[in-house]
C-alpha cells in the first residue's frame, strides 16, 4: 500500500491500524479506525442518538449497520430497524424529533428524491429534538443512476448543510449538528460522498452524551401545516437565513488560511480540502478557504476574492459553490472550476484532478506488479435471478415485440450478457408503472421485473394503479428474501408478498409462486406463458433465498 494512498484515507505512514471499535463506550479520547460512514454512526451514538431510520443504499448502508451492531445502541435501545423506503424513514425520524429525541435519517443521494416531500416540509415544521438527514452522494455513479448533488436539496429546503472534509470531522460534526438543530429548531443535512463514506481513518472519540428525555414541542401548532400556519412558518424560516449565514461565516468548520502566493485562491469544499492539502506537506502556498458548513460563507469568499487574482473552486459533485460564487461576485473576477474545464465536469473529484487544476507536476506513479483479473458485474453463481431470467427469455422468444421493464436491484444485471433480458431501469418502482404505461399505449406483452424489497419500497402504489385499471401486464417479483444488492438487509415484505398483492386487489388465482431452479424450468415457463396470456394484472413470484445470505445462514447454523 503506497504512502500516497495512506495519506488519502488519513492514515499516517507508520501508524498501526487501531482495532477495538466495540470497546467500553465511556472512554474519552479513545481511537478507532473507521469508515466515514462508521464515523458518522459513532458520532451520532455518542451525541445521544435515540433513533436511526434508513433504507439501504450504497454508499450510506454502513451507517445504519454500524449502529445495529454497536453495544451501546443495544444498551440504550436505540431504534435501528430498516424502513420500507426513504420517505417513511424521514417521517418516522420527524416523529421522534417531535417527541424531543435526537433522530437521524440515512439514505443515498437518489433516496432524497423519495424523501423530498417530508424532507422539505420538515424545514417548515421545524424540529424539537435534533434531526440530521444524512445523504451519501455517489459522484462517478459507482452504484447509482445519476450523480445528483444533495447540497441542492439543502438550498432548496433553506436549511443548513454540513460536509465533512475528513472522518474525524464527520465524527465531530454529529454532536455539533445535533446541537445546531436543537438550537435553531431546524433539521440539518449532512452530505457525504463515496470516498468519504468508504475510506478509513483514525478517529479520536470524545465524551458520550446521554439521550434526551421525551418532551412535547413548545409550540405544537407549528406542526400543523395548514396554509395559515405554513405561511407563518415560511416567514420564520426565511428570517432564520441571516442567522444560518452568520453561523457559517463564523463556523469552526469554515476556515480561511492566508498564503504567500495571491495569484490564486482555492476554495475547497468537503473532501476536496483533504485532497488539496495532501499535495502540500508544508502548507499550501495559495490562500485556502475550507468550506464544510453552508450556506456559503459569503464574507469569507469576498475576503479571498479581494486579495487573489483568480479563484479555483474544488468540490466533489456538481458546481454548486462555483455557481453561487459567480452570483456573489460581480467584479469580473476570474473563477475556475468545473464550469470552465480546469476540473472535469463529470465524475468524482480526485487528487489527480487537483494536481492538474493547480498546474503542478504529479508524483511519479509506478505500474502495478501484477494485473488484477477483471471482475465484470454479474449475477452470482446459483442466484435465483439467473433461472428466472432464463425462463422469461425463453417464453418471450415466442412473441415478436416483447418488452421487459426492470428495476433497481441485483436483477438489474439481467441487462448484461448472457441474458440481455431487460429494456429499462430508471428508478425504484418504475418497472411496474412503466409496464402499465407501455400497456396503455398498446404494448403486448408488457412485463415488469422487480425485487421483493423494491416492491415494498415503491412498487405497491404502481400495482394499485394497474389493478384499478385492470392493466394487461405481467409482474415478476423476484423474491430472494432479502435486500441483496446492498448486503443482505431485511426486506419489509418477506413472507407476505402474496397477501400484499391480494390485498391490493390482484386475483388470487393470478398470484403464482414458483421456486426458480433448473429442475423447475418447465413449470416456470408454463406459468409465465399462462400469465402473459391472461388479460389483466398477474403476479409471478419466483422465490428462492439469495445465495449469499443462504451461505451466511448455513455458516451460522454450523457455529
Residue ranges and their predicted role:
Residues 18-167, 195, 259, 285, 415-539, 547-554, ...:
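Thiamine diphosphate
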Amino acid at each position: 500500500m503506497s504512502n500516497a494512498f495512506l495519506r488519502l484515507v488519513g492514515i499516517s505512514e507508520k501508524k498501526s491500524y487501531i482495532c477495538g471499535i466495540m470497546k467500553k463506550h465511556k472512554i474519552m479520547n479513545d481511537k478507532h479506525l473507521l469508515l466515514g460512514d462508521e464515523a458518522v454512526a459513532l458520532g451520532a451514538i455518542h451525541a445521544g442518538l435515540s433513533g436511526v431510520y434508513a433504507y439501504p443504499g450504497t454508499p450510506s448502508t454502513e451507517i445504519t449497520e454500524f449502529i445495529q451492531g454497536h453495544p451501546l445502541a443495544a444498551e440504550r435501545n436505540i431504534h435501528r430497524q430498516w424502513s420500507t423506503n426513504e420517505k417513511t424513514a424521514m417521517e418516522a425520524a420527524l416523529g421522534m424529533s417531535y417527541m424531543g429525541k435526537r433522530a437521524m435519517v440515512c439514505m443515498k443521494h437518489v433516496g432524497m428524491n423519495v424523501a423530498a416531500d417530508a424532507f422539505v416540509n420538515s424545514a417548515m415544521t421545524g424540529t424539537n429534538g435534533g434531526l440530521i438527514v444524512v445523504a451519501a452522494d455517489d459522484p462517478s455513479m459507482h452504484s447509482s443512476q445519476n450523480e445528483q448533488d444533495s447540497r441542492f436539496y439543502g438550498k432548496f429546503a433553506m436549511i443548513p448543510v454540513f460536509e465533512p472534509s475528513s472522518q474525524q470531522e464527520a465524527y465531530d460534526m454529529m454532536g455539533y449538528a445535533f446541537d445546531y438543530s436543537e438550537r435553531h429548531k431546524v433539521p440539518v443535512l449532512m452530505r457525504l460522498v463515496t470516498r468519504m463514506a468508504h475510506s478509513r481513518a483514525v478517529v479520536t472519540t470524545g465524551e458520550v452524551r446521554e439521550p434526551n428525555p421525551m418532551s412535547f414541542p413548545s409550540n405544537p401548532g407549528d406542526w400543523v401545516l395548514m396554509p395559515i400556519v405554513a405561511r407563518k412558518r415560511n416567514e420564520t424560516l426565511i428570517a432564520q437565513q441571516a442567522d444560518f449565514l452568520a453561523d457559517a461565516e463564523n463556523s469552526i468548520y469554515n476556515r480561511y488560511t492566508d498564503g504567500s502566493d495571491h495569484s490564486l485562491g482555492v476554495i475547497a469544499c468537503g473532501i476536496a480540502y483533504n485532497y488539496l492539502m495532501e499535495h502540500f506537506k508544508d502548507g499550501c502556498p495559495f490562500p485556502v478557504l475550507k468550506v464544510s458548513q453552508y450556506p456559503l460563507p459569503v464574507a469569507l469568499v469576498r475576503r479571498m476574492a479581494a486579495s487573489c487574482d483568480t479563484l479555483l473552486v474544488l468540490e466533489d459533485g456538481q458546481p454548486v459553490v462555483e455557481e453561487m460564487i459567480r452570483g456573489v461576485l460581480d467584479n469580473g473576477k476570474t473563477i475556475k472550476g468545473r464550469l470552465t474545464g480546469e476540473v472535469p465536469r463529470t465524475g468524482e473529484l480526485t487528487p489527480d484532478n487537483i494536481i492538474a487544476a493547480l498546474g503542478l507536476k504529479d508524483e511519479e506513479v509506478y505500474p502495478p506488479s501484477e494485473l488484477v483479473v477483471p471482475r465484470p458485474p454479474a449475477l452470482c453463481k446459483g442466484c435465483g435471478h439467473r433461472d428466472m431470467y432464463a425462463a422469461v427469455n425463453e417464453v418471450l422468444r415466442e412473441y415478436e415485440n416483447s418488452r421487459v421493464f426492470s428495476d433497481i436491484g441485483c436483477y438489474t444485471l439481467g441487462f448484461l450478457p448472457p441474458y440481455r433480458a431487460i429494456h429499462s431501469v430508471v428508478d425504484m418502482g418504475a418497472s411496474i408503472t412503466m409496464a402499465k404505461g407501455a400497456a396503455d399505449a398498446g404494448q403486448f406483452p408488457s412485463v415488469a421485473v422487480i425485487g421483493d424489497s423494491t416492491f415494498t419500497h415503491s412498487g405497491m402504489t404502481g400495482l394499485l394503479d394497474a389493478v384499478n385499471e385492470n392493466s394487461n401486464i405481467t409482474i415478476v417479483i423476484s423474491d430472494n428474501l432479502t435486500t441483496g444488492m446492498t448486503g443482505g438487509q431485511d426486506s419489509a415484505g418477506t413472507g407476505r408478498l402474496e397477501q400484499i398483492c391480494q390485498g391490493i386487489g390482484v386475483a388470487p388465482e393470478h398470484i403464482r409462486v414458483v421456486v426458480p431452479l433448473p429442475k423447475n424450468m418447465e413449470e416456470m415457463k408454463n406459468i409465465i406463458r399462462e400469465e402473459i396470456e391472461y388479460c389483466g394484472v398477474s403476479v409471478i413470484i419466483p422465490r428462492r433465498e439469495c445465495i449469499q445470505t443462504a451461505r451466511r445462514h448455513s455458516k451460522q447454523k454450523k457455529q
